[in-house]
Amino acid sequence: MESRKNSDRQMRRANCFSAGERMKTRSPSVIVIGGGFGGISAARTLQDASFQVMVLESRDRIGGRVHTDYSFGFPVDLGASWLHGVCKENPLAPVIGRLGLPLYRTSGDNSVLYDHDLESYALFDMDGNQVPQELVTQIGVTFERILEEINKVRDEQDADISISQAFSIVFSRKPELRLEGLAHNVLQWYVCRMEGWFAADAETISAKCWDQEELLPGGHGLMVRGYRPVINTLAKGLDIRVGHRVTKIVRRYNGVKVTTENGQTFVADAAVIAVPLGVLKSGTIKFEPKLPEWKQEAINDLGVGIENKIILHFEKVFWPKVEFLGVVAETSYGCSYFLNLHKATGHPVLVYMPAGQLAKDIEKMSDEAAANFAVLQLQRILPDALPPVQYLVSRWGSDVNSMGSYSYDIVGKPHDLYERLRVPVDNLFFAGEATSSSFPGSVHGAYSTGLMAAEDCRMRVLERYGELDLFQPVMGEEGPASVPLLISRL
């Protein structure tokens, strides 16, 4: 009992946002933990609504799993790089449009490959022979038929099954869909791209929930100049403390106290927790009192996938003028996918993107070994491939600041876990892509949950002041006229 009194007394003596300052300025205070798109959008919105806001970020930069690198002399994204849903309905569209940032559209709506159309590509077998495009298109139709049959199978099942198990059931019922030889290998490449979308292996992806996210219209567009200009614009003027790794969050009726790894403490009326799901799963942030069981179950039961990038910068272009290259194989694990950034940016860059178990295995390699592995895959299809002059390797799975790439639905767990993770706990509010039931795993999903967390926080905190009309509305206010997105496809 005495320790709780001491804790409350410490909060009243806040050295960051003191009670006296709050009474004088009538501005409530919020600590935002995590400087990714979810955290920054929440902080931006709350500060614009006259809150005192501080952002604590563990890295030495903002952006989180959005990381634009300039070491090649031009921008490349090591993390998220697509705008999923190139349309005015996308919550990020107004920001991107006003900045005049160009996008390169890689697919339209309802593409069998999600973020690519079957319009500009080259697939090869392990011997370097190009796969006929007619066969690729034909297998694409078969893949869509299999997915339709999977949906029928899952609707008949009481218990959830994995996508991999569902494939087996479909093949037993519809043997004509079972393929052999090169056709089978092409089908495995489609599975490989599906696994890339979820950053997970088919053995772990839920058949009941795999298609529950909302896909905005307009297809998918690459951010030609990277995402950094967007996050920097949103963060302008915010009080952001980088290098502040949070280790403990104490919540009481009269506020929150946040402790960082170096022993610093900060207090405020409320906190927005916008760290990656993988970090919450790791338990490196201690909560006092513990989070309620329903919240902890949501953290435990949501899946976190891994997709990495090995970005290869070459002296010149030596590959076909297509949007992507691929290698087909007997298993999805053996397949490869290279994104051709030259089509979008004009720079001689290929991006090798492994996901799931393959990504985990590559993370065990050194950067040099990982780059050599990617080049080896490239040499399977282009024997005269040049060595890269520079390379970059992401490690989202082993990075202590992320512990994974993005969330997905695992077998046997309900899709409403995303919403459960978003729901506030007293004066703790949650944001990030893993709290978006409509747009999980996306930048605009993280951004939109930051807006929602800010609104929830605003309403709860300001109720204590009893003067909601003193502050600007956070959401739904009229902003400047939207600017059309700059979209190209060469």
Curated annotation (Swiss-Prot):
The UniProt record gives the binding positions of FAD as: 57, 65, 246, 433
What is the main EC category here? oxidoreductase
Q: In which broad location class does this protein mainly occur, judging by the first location in its UniProt entry?
A: other
Pathway assigned to this chain's UniProt record: Amine and polyamine degradation; spermine degradation; Amine and polyamine degradation; spermidine degradation
Tell me the cofactors it needs: FAD
Q: Gene3D superfamilies under this entry?
A: 3.90.660.10, FAD/NAD(P)-binding domain
Superkingdom of source: Eukaryota
Q: Which GO terms describe its molecular function?
A: N(1)-acetylpolyamine oxidase (3-acetamidopropanal-forming) activity; polyamine oxidase activity; spermine oxidase activity
Q: Is the keyword Flavoprotein in the record? A: yes
Q: Which InterPro entries match?
A: Amino_oxidase, FAD/NAD-bd_sf, Flavin_amine_oxidase, Flavin_monoamine_oxidase
Q: Which reaction does it catalyse?
A: spermine + O2 + H2O = 3-aminopropanal + spermidine + H2O2; N(1)-acetylspermine + O2 + H2O = 3-acetamidopropanal + spermidine + H2O2; spermidine + O2 + H2O = 3-aminopropanal + putrescine + H2O2
Keyword set for this entry? FAD, Flavoprotein, Oxidoreductase, Peroxisome
* Protein's cellular compartments: Peroxisome
- Cofactor annotation remark: Binds 1 FAD per subunit.
Q: Which biological process annotations from GO are given for this protein?
A: polyamine catabolic process; spermidine catabolic process; spermine catabolic process
Motif position, Microbody targeting signal: 488-490
Q: What is the tissue localization of expression for this protein? A: Highly expressed in flowers and siliques. Also found in leaf and stem and in low levels in cotyledons, roots and in seedlings.
Q: List the disulfide bonds.
A: none
Q: What does UniProt give as GO cellular component? A: peroxisome
**Enzyme Commission identifier(s):** 1.5.3.-
Upregulating conditions: By abscisic acid, jasmonate, salicylic acid, wounding and flagellin 22, a pathogen elicitor.
The cross-references to PANTHER family, in alphabetical order and at most eight, read: FLAVIN MONOAMINE OXIDASE, LYSINE-SPECIFIC HISTONE DEMETHYLASE 1A
Protein family (similarity comment): Belongs to the flavin monoamine oxidase family.
Q: What is this protein called?
A: Polyamine oxidase 2
Organism annotation: Arabidopsis thaliana
Taxonomic placement: Eukaryota, Viridiplantae, Streptophyta, Embryophyta, Tracheophyta
What gene does this protein come from? PAO2
